[in-house]
């Protein structure tokens, strides 16, 4: 099975609260990222599913109490009904918060996309995953600027494994990527949430860019799900 892709390599420490939509999913420890898309709702990857999750908002250094954090428990965790643990198709889930988050400069929403990302568009990926393959996670939020790759490049890197609901973001030459620990976290292009960190082979390896859930295919599912609960 593909590795869950969960740490940023070759990026930089985000300026504090530069990506205030980025949240940490916690079950006694940080295990995945997510994105705040409404005061009461977070989107993440379905492979990050846990029945109960504490969502930590306004975080920068997840090992320290910096005074800006808000912790809110989940009241519902909803995986996409067509999620496949086999090929990670439809790797998206929604987390309903037990109370809406208060928005401020540390905690803010990211817009859902109005269209799909295009090849070559530059995006910001943020997360707390490991900074070296197999190493411990970085405690400060890491950022990476990376381009959306073409479908041809993506399918060429992972023959037979890329569905229409996936896209590759990153560098074919390797050295910069998201990895274990960033899973579920955001890919933001032009102010819109276009990707969710999903999977990849290894981390920052040549010819194996990160694979991301294509959020633009799920906007109606997100709206319908939020409206129905």
UniProtKB/Swiss-Prot annotation:
<keyword id="KW-0378">Hydrolase</keyword>
<feature type="active site" description="Charge relay system">
    <location>
        <position position="91"/>
    </location>
</feature>
<protein>
    <recommendedName>
        <fullName>Trypsin</fullName>
        <ecNumber>3.4.21.4</ecNumber>
    </recommendedName>
</protein>
<keyword id="KW-1015">Disulfide bond</keyword>
<keyword id="KW-0964">Secreted</keyword>
<feature type="disulfide bond">
    <location>
        <begin position="116"/>
        <end position="216"/>
    </location>
</feature>
<feature type="domain" description="Peptidase S1">
    <location>
        <begin position="8"/>
        <end position="227"/>
    </location>
</feature>
<dbReference type="InterPro" id="IPR001254">
    <property type="entry name" value="Trypsin_dom"/>
</dbReference>
<feature type="disulfide bond">
    <location>
        <begin position="123"/>
        <end position="189"/>
    </location>
</feature>
<comment type="similarity">
    <text>Belongs to the peptidase S1 family.</text>
</comment>
<keyword id="KW-0645">Protease</keyword>
<keyword id="KW-0865">Zymogen</keyword>
<feature type="disulfide bond">
    <location>
        <begin position="179"/>
        <end position="203"/>
    </location>
</feature>
<feature type="disulfide bond">
    <location>
        <begin position="154"/>
        <end position="168"/>
    </location>
</feature>
<feature type="disulfide bond">
    <location>
        <begin position="32"/>
        <end position="48"/>
    </location>
</feature>
<dbReference type="InterPro" id="IPR033116">
    <property type="entry name" value="TRYPSIN_SER"/>
</dbReference>
<feature type="propeptide" description="Activation peptide">
    <location>
        <begin position="1"/>
        <end position="7"/>
    </location>
</feature>
<feature type="site" description="Required for specificity">
    <location>
        <position position="177"/>
    </location>
</feature>
<keyword id="KW-0720">Serine protease</keyword>
<dbReference type="GO" id="GO:0005615">
    <property type="term" value="C:extracellular space"/>
</dbReference>
<dbReference type="GO" id="GO:0046872">
    <property type="term" value="F:metal ion binding"/>
</dbReference>
<feature type="binding site">
    <location>
        <position position="69"/>
    </location>
    <ligand>
        <name>Ca(2+)</name>
    </ligand>
</feature>
<keyword id="KW-0479">Metal-binding</keyword>
<keyword id="KW-0106">Calcium</keyword>
<dbReference type="Pfam" id="PF00089">
    <property type="entry name" value="Trypsin"/>
</dbReference>
<dbReference type="GO" id="GO:0006508">
    <property type="term" value="P:proteolysis"/>
</dbReference>
<dbReference type="InterPro" id="IPR018114">
    <property type="entry name" value="TRYPSIN_HIS"/>
</dbReference>
<dbReference type="InterPro" id="IPR001314">
    <property type="entry name" value="Peptidase_S1A"/>
</dbReference>
<dbReference type="InterPro" id="IPR043504">
    <property type="entry name" value="Peptidase_S1_PA_chymotrypsin"/>
</dbReference>
<dbReference type="InterPro" id="IPR009003">
    <property type="entry name" value="Peptidase_S1_PA"/>
</dbReference>
<feature type="active site" description="Charge relay system">
    <location>
        <position position="47"/>
    </location>
</feature>
<dbReference type="GO" id="GO:0007586">
    <property type="term" value="P:digestion"/>
</dbReference>
<keyword id="KW-0222">Digestion</keyword>
<feature type="binding site">
    <location>
        <position position="59"/>
    </location>
    <ligand>
        <name>Ca(2+)</name>
    </ligand>
</feature>
<dbReference type="GO" id="GO:0004252">
    <property type="term" value="F:serine-type endopeptidase activity"/>
</dbReference>
<dbReference type="InterPro" id="IPR050127">
    <property type="entry name" value="Serine_Proteases_S1"/>
</dbReference>
<feature type="active site" description="Charge relay system">
    <location>
        <position position="183"/>
    </location>
</feature>
<feature type="disulfide bond">
    <location>
        <begin position="14"/>
        <end position="143"/>
    </location>
</feature>
């Amino acid at each position: 099975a593909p590795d869950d892709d969960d740490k940023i390599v070759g990026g930089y420490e985000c300026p504090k609260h530069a990506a205030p939509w980025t949240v940490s999913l916690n079950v006694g420890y940080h295990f995945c990222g997510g994105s705040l898309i409404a005061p009461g709702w977070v989107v993440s990857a379905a492979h990050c599913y846990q029945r109960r999750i504490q969502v930590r908002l306004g975080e920068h250094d997840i090992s320290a109490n910096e005074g800006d954090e808000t912790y809110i428990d989940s009241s519902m965790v909803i995986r996409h009904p067509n999620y496949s643990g086999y090929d990670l198709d439809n790797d998206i889930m929604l987390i309903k918060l037990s109370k809406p988050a208060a928005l401020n400069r540390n905690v803010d929403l990211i817009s859902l996309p109005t269209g799909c990302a295009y090849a070559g568009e530059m995006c910001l990926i943020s997360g707390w995953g490991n900074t070296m393959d197999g190493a411990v996670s970085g405690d400060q939020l890491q950022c990476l600027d990376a381009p959306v790759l073409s479908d041809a490049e993506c399918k060429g890197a992972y023959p037979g494994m890329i569905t229409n609901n996936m896209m590759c973001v990153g560098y074919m030459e390797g050295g910069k990527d998201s990895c274990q620990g960033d899973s579920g976290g955001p890919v933001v292009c032009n102010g819109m949430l276009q990707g969710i960190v999903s999977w990849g082979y290894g981390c920052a390896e040549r010819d194996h860019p990160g694979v991301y859930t294509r959020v633009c295919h799920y906007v109606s599912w997100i709206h319908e799900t939020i409206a129905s609960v």
